[in-house]
């Protein structure tokens, strides 16, 4: 748990919010968001998603004027009013801001865009090409891991003359592509052209996950986010991010990821995440390592280092198992499998495309003998959640202490980087202090995890709240990391809590996001 004096926190917080606002609390990621924002916010983000003056490649034969005319009638501009919650003061939101992005119409009277275009939204509007009218929109479903969102508009006038785009296939290398959208620099639709450079497993900046992505040299700038990438008369993907460290490197979400998202929403009514084996592993490129684990000269695979106890793999696989193949496809010593001709891709792509509770067949070498296991896959929450969009953070306030679960946004905001890997997400996370006589002498404690409340091990934030609220002893004792101890007179602390809430204009002593209690 983290203890921080409020006045010091306020000064520190102000600096942090200026420096990380354009990152949407993800400053450690390599790839920047592609989002058109108000002037101040755009300036803070320009280092990540700035444009390039490099000359764009000429159009190839499969990006024709007819395909451009067809696609332009599907593209829309998205206007977003949003307010992000304060990570360090979780009972409040920051002032509203405006941003924008792109989107396009798909079948079923739906609009597809990026999740980061509408994240933390309060109000959404959409304007179609060639129209001055803005239409109110609602988010039907959102997947932050895959950076996709579905919008709906309850106005039949909007849908007149709108042409839905069909999903195509993964483009080939060097195939020409046209990216549509509303990037910075103007108000009308923009079209940039380029070629497919790579198709590989890539880190998605917004959600912090790794999924299949298309790399292109077509210009992708702030505001392009959510716009379609077109090949012929079909959509090859959704523009979503770029590499700020290099020229002409933009990224497109490919149709397999899009189809997985859309199918999950259609079948389950909501997005449920991407499946994973949830293991940590190492490559087997060293011949001495392969010999030690009794791998034959023809064998290739990966070495399991650790397995998440919450996953189905934990019941069947073991540390030091060698995974040789997945669904009868051999895994190389570099953890990659064959993908389209001579292209290779990380084996996790096969797992991520599975539906909830489907199985993968793993061929495993254990103690020199081969085995086969059917492993059920499902989305498994990370130890520390990488994002917390579209909701207030969970917290609990007692006697001026503010308890919150550990999250990556909190780590980013407080510059705590080394503790992320050692806490489980269901544990009570950090704590800061609202100054009061009741907690005098404790305000200098920081970066300390709460271990016990009155001798009982803390399981999660809700459990901590219950332990505090049902205290029957005169003193409340909190045992912290590094053998630190907090003792409060319970009756006095209970009375002080109400006064502190009133003094700091905090509407409630607690807020729960129940995903933390599972």
UniProtKB/Swiss-Prot annotation:
Pfam families on file: PDZ_3, Trypsin_2
One cellular-component annotation, GO: mitochondrial membrane
PANTHER family, per database record: PROTEASE DO-LIKE 10, MITOCHONDRIAL-RELATED, PTHR45980
Alphabetical GO biological process terms: proteolysis
Location within or outside the cell: Mitochondrion membrane
EC assignment: 3.4.21.-
Active site: 116 (charge relay system), 147 (charge relay system), 225 (charge relay system)
This protein's encoding gene: DEGP4
Segments forming domain PDZ: 278-358
Protein name: Protease Do-like 4, mitochondrial
Keywords: Hydrolase, Membrane, Mitochondrion, Protease, Serine protease, Transit peptide
Alphabetized GO MF terms: serine-type endopeptidase activity
Primary role: Putative serine protease.
Serine protease as annotated region, ranges: 98-262
InterPro entries given in the database record: DEGP_PDZ, DEGP_PDZ_sf, PDZ_sf, Peptidase_S1_PA, Peptidase_S1_PA_chymotrypsin, Peptidase_S1C
Family: Belongs to the peptidase S1C family.
Record organism: Arabidopsis thaliana
Keyword Cell inner membrane recorded: no
Range annotated as the organelle transit peptide: 1-23
EC class of the enzyme, as a word: hydrolase
